[in-house]
């Protein structure tokens, strides 16, 4: 047994537990125990002193990120996947692991039924090829097609659909166990039945690309909607006379709030305010598109042109479409804006696990894990935040 000292655990903003800890490691390098420093000395129950593996000097430890909204990368768009893309998909998953991401919910934006089902079949095959050191494919995130036309953003109008059980079955029949989330507009006629069916299937339902007002959002939350997709974007804004879905979600306190922390989708001030208003609800997502991992410039997105500049993706008409930034870049930016490192890390590494019921807290996410699979976060004297493999 070895022990690492002076380690910090990320926690939500305002959580008083973010102080320095011991980490106990097995001979194989797995974390076997975590305890606050000062509560016990550096010895085991027989009084034998544990070998000291060194001090981390207040650095943070975390699992790798979980990205619940990522649309592709390295030139692959998940809704366009075909069987011959499998090798490139595995390459992308390896790339994501090297970018600090443990698992993703591959996001399938609004598209035709046949391409959607074809993409889910490719993802099913890829899941069987998972191995250590490769980003894991969770269930898919279906973002559409049951979206409000007035809030569709970059989603193609021709593939939007009215919600119904028949339309749902046509799209997901046979793949029900391989879907983690679905984003929809709950105010649409027929959405209530779809929400109920998704909940029966243990699929998390998110409100997004929606024109719902606060009262409509409240009804949706009562019916089981548990998340907002890219908060602030493609929904009514947060206003002092019209709180909208975001205001209602913050009031309740139990709705996850997906946040794109690139500084373009949401102004840094609003991102920090959201974190302060709803510290345990904020979940950092990338919303990365197919050009993630590629250079800025002109790229293709289905039949459209995607213009990428400094990590921001727009259609030719200027419509904001997504980013090409890694998820953990959002951690660095939110930490810089807020001057709160631990909460920013928590929002990308622990909070997403709660949404899809992988684990409920930081210690649960760390105990039993190989140190080499985890991340160590260091803030230098200039305030810059960096991460590296923990071992």
What are these regions (language model features)?
Residues 142, 148-167, 171-244:
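Divalent metal-binding pocket/active-site signature
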Residues 7, 29, 58, 69, ...:
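Divalent metal-coordination and catalytic microenvironments
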Residues 71-74, 79, 90-119, 135-148, ...:
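Divalent metal-dependent hydrolysis catalytic cores, especially in the metallo-beta-lactamase
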Residues 216-343, 348, 355-359, 378-383, ...:
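Active-site-adjacent C-terminal substructures of enzyme catalytic domains
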Residues 87, 119-124, 164-166, 241-246:
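Charged helix-capping and loop-helix junction motifs
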Residues 1-46, 387-391:
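N-terminal metal-binding scaffold of metallo-dependent hydrolase/deaminase domains
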Residues 3, 64-66, 206, 227, ...:
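Residue-level marker for buried hydrophobic side chains located in beta-strands
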